[in-house]
Regions:
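Conserved Rossmann-fold NAD(P)-dependent oxidoreductase catalytic core, especially the SDR/UDP-sugar
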Residues: 113-173
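N-terminal Rossmann NAD(P)H-binding glycine-rich loop of SDR-like oxidoreductase domains
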Residues: 6-26
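Conserved C-terminal active-site "lid" loop/helix of NAD(P)H-dependent oxidoreductases
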Residues: 248-275
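Rossmann-fold cofactor-recognition segment
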Residues: 56-72
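Glycine-rich NAD(P)-binding loop of the Rossmann-fold in SDR/ketoreductase-type enzymes
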Residues: 71, 102-113, 181-184, 227
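Alpha-helical substrate-binding/gating segment
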Residues: 207-214, 226-248, 257
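Active-site Tyr-X1-5-Lys
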Residues: 151-202
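NAD(P)H-binding glycine-rich loop region in Rossmannoid oxidoreductase-like domains
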Residues: 67-106
Length: 289
């Protein structure tokens, strides 16, 4: 099997570090990374997760890591071409704590620049785009999903959202709405490129659930879309293993197996044989209290 060269954007980030560490253990992959900054993700502080003194992000070897802004077209082009990258895992993005302008610039403009460059290279085979379960966060503004925010457990089963349900962004605040819309835009862009003549790059849009720094789930039904670090890595493994079988464009919800999860991962199981290894039952969470 030919060694695949994988480029991870946002490699210095929280999820980037998980995937760099995981994929680097596989001799079938040669892992590269780019990020605008080098430093421990702000997610640890935002989520009050303790870290050891001087803890640093897990990065590829220095000769395979580049300090690069995702909007720097020229540098990005050289990195992808010079290293003959085969697969791109696009994680680079700013969170909804930023301004609307910055979210649009990095998450939308940066993604378009990356897709533009990647789809013009014969050696690029696939892009795994880190979308988000927040693409459908607007459903929480209506029942039965709004009850989940209040931790009101439904007596009757409710319909899980599938990839066929139209995206609806959250309207909680302008930044959250901009973040949701930026992920919806990225998916639309991927669909557009995948249907264009002369482009052979496959696009997988992964609507990841709630991946937290502590890698634990709390008794909060709003967070029932939790995805463990182990299941995140399993999903990426399954996509890479099934690359040849995949359609040119696909969307997947990616979560662990938790009670009251409102996202349907059925096509993920059918296409990729993805079976979550982690999760929690509601009565187990109650017992721990």
């Amino acid at each position: 099997m030919m060694v695949k060269k994988i480029l991870i954007t946002g490699a210095s980030g929280f999820i980037g570090g998980i995937l760099v560490e995981h994929l680097s253990k596989n001799s079938n992959y040669d892992v590269y990374g780019i990020d605008k900054h080098i430093g421990l993700s702000s997610r640890y502080q935002l989520e009050n997760t303790s870290t050891s003194e001087g803890q640093q992000p897990i990065l590829p070897p220095k000769e395979k890591f580049y300090v690069c802004d995702i909007t720097d077209r020229n540098q990005l082009l050289h990195i992808i071409q010079d290293n003959q990258i085969n697969i791109i895992i696009h994680l680079a993005a700013v969170l909804d704590a930023e301004t609307v302008e910055k979210i649009n610039y990095i998450n939308c403009d940066g993604t378009k620049i990356l897709f533009d460059i990647a789809t013009q290279q014969d050696h690029v085979e696939m892009i795994i785009y880190a979308s988000s379960g927040l693409t459908v966060a607007g459903y929480f503004e209506n029942e039965p999903y709004s009850s989940l925010i209040k931790n009101i457990i439904q007596k009757e089963p409710f319909k899980k959202l599938t990839i066929n349900d139209p995206p609806i962004p959250s309207h909680v605040n302008p930044s959250r709405e901009a973040y949701c819309n930026s992920k919806i835009y990225g998916e639309q862009l991927a669909r557009q490129y995948s249907s264009s003549d002369g482009i052979n790059v496959k696009f997988v849009c992964a609507r990841f659930g709630w991946i937290n720094t502590a890698d634990t789930i709390t008794m909060d039904s709003f967070n029932s879309d939790w995805c463990s670090h182990r299941d995140l890595c399993q999903f990426i493994d399954r996509v890479l293993e099934n690359q040849l079988k995949l359609k040119r464009f696909q969307i997947y919800f990616v979560t662990s197996n938790t009670d009251f999860c409102w996202l349907d991962t059925g096509n993920c199981r059918e296409d990729l044989n993805y079976v979550p290894q982690d999760g929690a039952r509601w009565n187990q969470l109650l017992t721990k209290m």
